[in-house]
């Protein structure tokens, strides 16, 4: 089986359906005896350029290990799902399970935001 990194962008009006989409695509991989090494929901983010007159979209990252047939099935599902604005699949040499730079940045921001609040409470 090969390793793939998949990023897909979902229409912002469909953000509440993202967990169901993730479960569906996860189920496709697991049903074909594949593995999911990393799954990250990056949330709603600004797009670099407008897509269908939209400036924000919901991002999801998956690192999977599966057969080419399973990947073709997932990409086919992306094409026929109107909520998926764009998708990108990259073949990887090995499984990647570390946090992505996007998530590392989020953790750093959260830590920086939480620290001043704690300092304010301590000084009060």
UniProtKB/Swiss-Prot annotation:
Top-rank lineage group of the source organism: Bacteria
InterPro entries reported for this sequence: Ribosomal_bS6, Ribosomal_bS6_sf, Ribosomal_S6_plastid/chlpt, Transl_elong_EF1B/ribsomal_bS6
Recorded GO CC terms: cytosolic small ribosomal subunit
Sorted UniProt keywords: Ribonucleoprotein, Ribosomal protein, RNA-binding, rRNA-binding
Role, per record: Binds together with bS18 to 16S ribosomal RNA.
Matches recorded under HAMAP family: Ribosomal_bS6
Name of the protein in question: Small ribosomal subunit protein bS6
